[in-house]
Amino acid sequence: MPHIDIKCFPRELDEQQKAALAADITDVIIRHLNSKDSSISIALQQIQPESWQAIWDAEIEPQMEALIKKPGYSM
């Protein structure tokens, strides 16, 4: 596996841009985790800014110690 779950504010990404993002992330995961391309899955969820607090409360703040890249902001 790994499964990567990207959450971000809405972006105007066309299918080509999404494919390029997925390819770049896949390359990094293969290089650093020695994964196979076929074992990697990537989700892209666009979250409205007014809903971000819920993501912070449920996923970011409780996992702060496990994050390998911590945000430069707090809520």
From Swiss-Prot:
Q: What is its EC number?
A: 5.3.2.-
Q: What InterPro entries does the annotation carry? A: 4-OT-like_dom, Tautomerase/MIF_sf, Tautomerase_PptA
* GO molecular function terms noted in the UniProt entry: intramolecular oxidoreductase activity, interconverting keto- and enol-groups
What is any one of the record's Gene Ontology cellular component terms? cytoplasm
> Cross-referenced SUPFAM superfamilies, in alphabetical order?
Tautomerase/MIF
Whether Transcription counts among this entry's keywords is no
Top class in the EC scheme: isomerase
Q: In this UniProt entry, which cysteines form S-S bonds?
A: none
Which NCBIfam families does its entry note?
A: PRK01271.1
What protein name applies here?
Answer: Tautomerase PptA
- What gene name does this entry carry? pptA
